[in-house]
A protein has these predicted regions:
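Conserved nucleotide-binding and Mg2+-coordinating catalytic segments in signaling enzymes
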Residues: 174-185
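Juxtamembrane helix-loop boundaries in multi-pass membrane proteins
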Residues: 1, 144-147
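Juxtamembrane segments at transmembrane-helix boundaries
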Residues: 6-137, 144, 154, 160, ...
Length: 185
């Protein structure tokens, strides 16, 4: 959540003189937030996180955006598809434990992840909907729609993850309350 907050802070500072630096910082923070999100899901499901893949996203997204040799719309499509791949990975992790009953937190988290993926698909198929083009006059309504979907999706994702953690804690507390202290049965 801190990385996502820093993303929006950096985007708001893009109006200053050195807006390219703030723009790259915003995408770097956003990519770090995505990597932390995947790491938290791995840790929640008690899986070993693949650290090499988690480090790739921030580095590749900032390097991809800093390349001026390719067109801006192609850069947006490449970075959006990379982020979309990480969201599909998150959906895989959320549906990994199909034997367990899906609780409300997991369902809210899946809805948030699907909304996030929808916003990325909007950017993938209409690359005009991005701040990388720096010509927002023609793309203001789709850009606003994309940011609204992203902010609502992040709210759903954070709320769902906190609900999942609370429900897991409640299950563990109920299990410990049913165990006899002396016999551990």
């Amino acid at each position: 959540l801190v990385c996502y907050g820093m993303t929006y802070l950096s985007i708001s500072l893009m109006a200053s003189a050195g807006h390219v630096r703030w723009f790259l910082a915003a995408y770097g923070f956003f990519a770090c937030g995505q990597s932390c999100w995947i790491w938290a899901l791995h840790r929640f499901h008690q899986l070993r996180p693949p650290y090499a893949l988690l480090v790739v996203l921030p580095i590749v997204s900032v390097l991809g955006l800093s390349l001026d040799s390719i067109s801006a719309s192609l850069r947006v499509q490449l970075i959006s598809s990379l982020f979309l791949g990480y969201e599909i990975w998150a959906l895989y992790l959320l549906t990994l434990r199909r034997a367990e009953a899906m609780n409300r937190g997991t369902m809210v988290l899946i809805v948030g992840t699907l909304m996030f993926a929808a916003a990325l698909l909007l950017r993938l198929h209409t690359p005009v909907v991005s701040l990388t083009l720096r010509d927002t006059a023609a793309s203001t309504p789709p850009l606003l729609l994309s940011f609204v979907i992203l902010s609502i999706a992040m709210h759903f994702k954070s709320t769902g993850f906190l609900m999942m953690c609370h429900e897991r804690k409640q299950v563990l507390l109920d299990r410990m309350a049913n165990v006899d202290v002396l016999t551990e049965l």
